[in-house]
Amino acid sequence: MKAIKKSLTEEEYLYLDFSHQTKGCIFPLHTSVTLFLLSYCDCKIFKICLVVTKEVSTDSSLLRDDLIQDVEIQIISRQELPPIVQNCCLPAVVERSDNFCRAGLAVVLRHIIQKSYEADPLKKELLELLGFKKTCLKACAEVSQWTRLCELTIPLAIENFLRESSDQPPTIPVEILQLEKKLSEPVRVHNDDKLRRQKLKQQKADGVGPPLTKGKAKSKVHTQETSEELDSSSESLELKVAFSKLTVQEEPATTNREPSHIRKAKASDLPPLEHVFAEGLYFTLADIVLLPCIHHFLVIICKKFSEKLVEFPLLASWYQRIQEVPRVKTAASKCGIQFLHLPKLLTVSTEQRPNLSEVPGVEGHSDPLFIGGPRPTMAKLMEKGIEVMFSPHPCPTWTVDWNVLPAAVSPKEGKMSSDRALRKQQQLNNLVYVVTNQAKPGDRIVDFCSGGGHVGIVLAHMLPSCQVTLIENKELSLIRAKKRSDELGLSNIWFIQANMEYFTGMFNIGVALHACGVATDMVIEHCIKTRASFVTCPCCYGFIQNTSKFNFPKSEQFKKTLSYKEHMILCRFADQTAVQLPPQRRLIGKQCMCLVDLDRARAAEECGYSVQVISMEPESCSPKNNMIVGVPI
């Protein structure tokens, strides 16, 4: 084995799934996307491992044409994965210490970009892939439509399309049409007004565009246009702005004010900005993810069903434009992607275009209007025998002996005031008591939405015979938790930066302190799937809403009594428990919290659990002081 040169940073291993391959494409598409980003960033700082099943040939020569050129890739079996990675969905990145893992496509891709920039700080354009405020694909798929589109729906839809394609004209995946619809929507950027006024000025200088009084009519027909006009002129405002970002060049600041008729133009009269790339004007990580997926989709379409291209002209135009981005063609070539050229297929008449208004949106729900207070809803529940009811606290006076524990165990070590740290200790007293009374030697405990690790670190220290795993989507919070753990020398703790759904391991107890909105429901569902006990303290009731996974109310008992709108009214008022509110209002908020959590408890009971809704002690430890404790029967 060749000697590995020591570096200033800890060596990291990147693990990618491999199921099968076709010409120029490795499946699953998450792997193709990851390899394409590595090629685009010219990143060679990871030790790359392709993970295959026993049924797949491990002859690397068969894969060479579709892998990145000049990059060494090791082929291993799933049994050879480090234990922490065996508990996660791939792709995954793990440090050599084997106790810190990043899992899931969006998390791994963002990490690759960050590490590539750290390896070569001159490549500032790589950071631009993360978008405005560096938030591109940062939120989890459950709350971000772009993360869900890029990480889940588009790759899965195209994999199914490629698997099922035959000689018969196929049905275009609805996810493709949803993406086409998004490309037809007006662009929204942080400096929207400034750019639209610049565009208006440019249009007037070029003698194009309608008079200002007809600006609204222009906006109405925008969604029926393709990007044909955008492509026809390299001097268009959108392209100038987009490519200045790609080369990290700032346009010189102008000291001249805009003409009076431009400054005074109404916002409704300004021309809309047109999509240059997926999310709007700027080339981002979303484009990187979509490109390999859309390319392999178009290969089949052009080969067998070219007449279908009329159904997504904006997507075809985006595909052409993205090839002009610096380094994209080189990166694609290294990954075995041979771009298609579709110049004649972009000139599509208006009559041939599909009616995108009939395409369902990416979001499958809309928030109901909130009218009135919660009392009618609460009275309706009482008529059905459903009342506010808390189970007695098992030991309201029990506390962790914080004085004898190492300083790094206490939340006082975190960046918070002494009053807040005291309340955090009180919250932990409640959860730790329940968990320590349930846990047995050898149990695996998972701290979901762990944040800075306040719960998980205490449990790992107090239960050395148990394995504790912290799962958190925010990198900096998890890094702080690992630093505290390292100070304590804990050897029974894992750190996983991922959406909780990418944790696939078995466990015995799931814990979550103040998991926001539907995250509490995701934790409970995850525990029920593995028949694990759960101890959760919900938060952010106002963020609860129907999602692709959950519909509210959840339990059959509540469904028979309340509509979704009535349940949302309870959630809205459940958030009104802040200490500065009047006592009567806080009481109603506490009652609404209890009813929302009783619905969660009843739903878990329908799945074979014994569940209690308990009020934490003292109640002043937090405005959100409910605790839902469930044990499989």
UniProtKB/Swiss-Prot annotation:
Keywords: Cytoplasm, Phosphoprotein. Residues 130-332 form the GST C-terminal domain. Residues 190-232 are annotated as: Disordered. CDD domains: GST_C_family (cd00299). The modification Phosphoserine is found at residue 233. InterPro entries: Glutathione-S-Trfase_C-like, Glutathione-S-Trfase_C_sf, Methyltranfer_dom, SAM-dependent_MTases_sf. It is found in: Cytoplasm. Pfam families: Methyltransf_32. GO terms for cellular component: cytoplasm. Belongs to the GSTCD family. This is Glutathione S-transferase C-terminal domain-containing protein. The gene is GSTCD.
